[in-house]
Amino acid sequence: MRYNQFSYIPTSLERAAEELKELGFDLDLQKTAKANLESFLRKLFFHYPDSDYPLSHLIAKNDMDALSFFQSEQELSKEVFDLLALQVLGFIPGVDFTEADAFLDKLAFPIHFDETEIIKHIHHLLATRCKSGMTLIDDLVSQGMLTMDNDYHFFNGKSLATFDTSQLIREVVYVEAPLDTDQDGQLDLIKVNIIRPQSQKPLPTLMTPSPYHQGINEVANDKKLYRMEKELVVKKRRQITVEDRDFIPLETQPCKLPIGQNLESFSYINSYSLNDYFLARGFANIYVSGVGTAGSTGFMTSGDYAQIESFKAVIDWLNGRATAYTSHSKTHQVRADWANGLVCTTGKSYLGTMSTGLATTGVDGLAMIIAESAISSWYNYYRENGLVCSPGGYPGEDLDVLTELTYSRNLLAGDYLRHNDHYQELLNQQSQALDRQSGDYNQFWHDRNYLKNAHQIKCDVVYTHGLQDWNVKPRQVYEIFNALPSTINKHLFLHQGEHVYMHNWQSIDFRESMNALLCQKLLGLANDFSLPEMIWQDNTCPQNWQERKVFGTSTIKELDLGQELLLIDNHYGEDEFKAYGKDFRASKAALFKGKANQALIDILLEEDLPINGEIVLQLKVKSSENKGLLSAQILDYGKKKRLGDLPIALTQSSIDNGQNFSREPLKELPFREDSYRVISKGFMNLQNRNNLSSIETIPNNKWMTVRLPLQPTIYHLEKGDTLRVILYTTDFEHTVRDNSNYALTIDLSQSQLIVPIASN
């Protein structure tokens, strides 16, 4: 374990003493440091009628237990404080450590003993994470140190778990959206699942916009998947034009219906544990799946601003600007009289994507988004540089396949009976509009590009993204984060994992940082919390996070690739082609070992190479035919210890998100030896070699200069490392699988790898 503490708010002595007193700690500025520490420790053992017993189980020195120490005349020292602090946080002498000083250095322990600062040290210790993954104060509250009185209690600028999660209100309302996406002449109704604590105070809301939450149709999804085996189409030379079109909602009328009291209820919904954490701290949770999902009406429009509007309508309802009904019969309306109107959205992948889309509407009431692994342009999710390009791990998927997966109205037999025929018509229109034949950008994709509206974002923004996420690739967060207005508060956590959540990792206090931010934004708490704009997980060692100023630098270093002419054959033998088509992982293994159809260049680094931004391959290339697909991957190659991309569980249920509520495992990325690490990758239809909107012809056997931008990253390579460049055509995981007989030739003498370099 290593501390990377970003959530602690430096506190004055007077404020620290006041907060400790509010928690029931009997500390006194007039007492000695030793007396205050003893009083603090005895309070920790509030379950015991006799605190001597648990105190005797701690050691103050290698040859003295804590009880004996406090009964002695010996003075408090750094050695004693450090040893007791470690034990209070769950570290066991002789098991987790033998030499406390060396262990504290390894931990990067954030508290440095000064006898005159003992009150502040105790305050800081309570806000520091235990070995279990919880802060000490959260651990104590979870054990019942504070009663669940359904009111707010704060410590170090963060809300504590004092809301009773055993007496939650679970209710359903149906919000009227200014849409008619299924063209039935009726405004669409949006089902909203609400979970909130009982409270006399208006509550802020965490809203998870999740098209998955009302169920998914995997059977329809699998039937809709596309075969990837097809020839690369030769496109006509042309210029693509699109236009920015404002979304115009339909008119709605003020509701004059009586207020209803009997709301639909539910017992369970698959929740997000970060939401659960905040539910116990006085934040209502709502789950909304939007148009075209079970319990709602409308068509699944998948990514456009009509779908976004169906979530926006819920925020409007929370602020009294939209109508909600008690049921589909629309006999009574219901008002969000429990809400304070301030909302933060949460969730990963499609969920985080909807958060980004919502933020670009500038809707009043949306105070903050926490968007994890989020899409900012749907074209860049299913296409790349004029190519059909599947998200990592999902060859054959496209946006209409996702529509089939999430149109959960068809999981309700009655809805299927009444609406499926019309749904299939709308789905066919969507399939035509996305133009899988060419892979080109068009109006359909432009209408699903949130980047063009980034300037309208006015809420606070928090993004997390994995630099090993080849599903929602790093370009998605790179482009939206760098497009955000300079006038807003923005934060980015870049980790070394894949498509994963990071709130329960051991090495980063993400939950606590979000707590401090949300108390500021949604509860109006003046806590003086300041979070760095960007925090990056160091790839060279375990559990190390660093502040960064920018994602993408203008300083570059050009690396020569060699002097040879390299030939890349596109065609595989029939058996090999079929085998790779059945198992794209086998093709990746062959590719990384240099056993596929490829050009391979190894560069031994003579100095450190700190990459920050978008690597570009500038290549002199020609094709034997009038078409060509170019793929590239950059590897950190050679055996050494690296971070894994999938977090592993260190414990099974050590994190309590309330008071014995929604327990979850503590996780972390492992640090272990492997043979390589993908740094970046990229794909291009050579007919789109100049830009996305220009379709060019490819002259047979004529040299072309191509600039292939790869996925942005921040990655530190060290002197002596090997940078492996792999150039090839078909990628069996991502691109169409064209097995026609053509070849690409690369002139390495006129080619470079252009690397953005991080400044010191």
Curated annotation (Swiss-Prot):
Short name of one Pfam family: Peptidase_S15
Domain of life where this protein originates: Bacteria
Catalytic residue positions: S349, D469, H499
GO molecular function: aminopeptidase activity; dipeptidyl-peptidase activity; serine-type peptidase activity
Subcellular location: Cytoplasm
Top-rank EC class of the record's enzyme: hydrolase
Assigned GO CC terms: cytoplasm
Keyword Cell membrane belongs to the record: no
Protein EC: 3.4.14.11
A biological-process GO annotation: proteolysis
Keyword Hydrolase attached: yes
Main location: cytoplasm
Reaction it catalyzes: Hydrolyzes Xaa-Pro-|- bonds to release unblocked, N-terminal dipeptides from substrates including Ala-Pro-|-p-nitroanilide and (sequentially) Tyr-Pro-|-Phe-Pro-|-Gly-Pro-|-Ile
Keywords: Aminopeptidase, Cytoplasm, Hydrolase, Protease, Serine protease
Main function: Removes N-terminal dipeptides sequentially from polypeptides having unsubstituted N-termini provided that the penultimate residue is proline.
Subunit structure: Homodimer.
Family: Belongs to the peptidase S15 family.
Protein name from the UniProt record: Xaa-Pro dipeptidyl-peptidase
Species for this entry: Streptococcus pyogenes serotype M12 (strain MGAS2096)
